[in-house]
Amino acid sequence: MRHLGAILLCFAVGCGATNVSHGGTGGTGGTGGGKGDTGGGSGGTGGGGTGGSGGGTGTDGCSDAAKLIYTIDQDGTFSSFKPDQTDITKSVFTDIGKLNCNAGLAQPFSMSVDRNATAWVEYFDQVTTSKLFKVSTANAACTATTFMGGQQGFNEFGMGFVSNAAGSTDETLFIGGGGTVGGASNLGTLDINTLTIAKVGSLTGDPELTGTGLAELWGFFPDLTANTMQAHISKIDKTSGAESMQISLGSAAGMANAWAFAFYGGEFFVFLAKSNGATTVYHVTTAGLKDQLDTGSRHIVGAGVSTCAPTTPIG
């Protein structure tokens, strides 16, 4: 995910230390993350309390926790999100914990989670390059990696694991980004064993990514240019970055401030805040916008889901 407001502020006045408490990870997440600025609160719909990884491992090798969406609020709260695909107002947020990755001035920017329920969380400070941490989805413990930011021009990026073939347990971490948020962007892969980036192709716009167990890569392209580019979702060719199957989101028009994106049950959930307001969750099918949810006081800067998530609607 990206958080445009914080970036614009840094360019205008310069960024010092922020009083941000970073949210812990729970369950397994796909794409998302994002920059949180100061202030804001959690709250919103759904239950509170703390949660763990939860559930045993099924025949697909996935825990129950690996099948939920996870979100990060600008105040650092990490929560699970169980969508109700029949009535979105019955969807439940459950707050899990706080991240404490000792990333200096950098803030959560994007995240993905592998099928082993390990979260890969990117931090970015708008000045240097990204840092990458591995986060336990059971207790939010952070472990720094040796990832070197800035490879192939990817100073910042959104990311999402994608199954290598439909139903496969093998997966690849795709990334999309570039030098600055909202600027020219490229599609690439990040090898989680060597922590090296390989460029795949160019992207139109600067999307947040989500992957699926169907071996598909999708992007949410927010409106970053005062309505000159309509907010939309597109399927992205994993070999070139080309878009297809574009789904327009007219009601999501307007300058985006914070956005995140996740696939679940054959459908999509866009977490979008305009200016510094609360996040609205847009429930989207391939036919277009289905319904939406007001999250109350949540200002979500990241969301994601693993390739273990269901690929057909489950209610």
Predicted regions and their residues:
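Ser/Thr-rich, Pro/Gly/Ala-heavy low-complexity intrinsically disordered linkers and tails
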Residues: 10-64
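An edge-strand/N-cap motif at the start of beta-rich repeat modules
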Residues: 58-87
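Repeated scaffold domains used in trafficking and secretory/extracellular systems
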Residues: 60, 101-114, 150-164, 202-214, ...
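Conserved beta-propeller blade signature
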Residues: 68-71, 79, 118-122, 166-176, ...
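Short loop/turn segments immediately following the C-termini of beta-strands
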Residues: 73-74, 83, 124-126, 164, ...
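Structural motif
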Residues: 75-82, 127-135, 181-189, 226-235, ...
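Short loop/turn segments that connect beta-strands within beta-propeller blades
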Residues: 83-86, 135-140, 191-195, 237-241, ...
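Beta-propeller fold detector
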Residues: 88-101, 142-150, 196-205, 242-251, ...
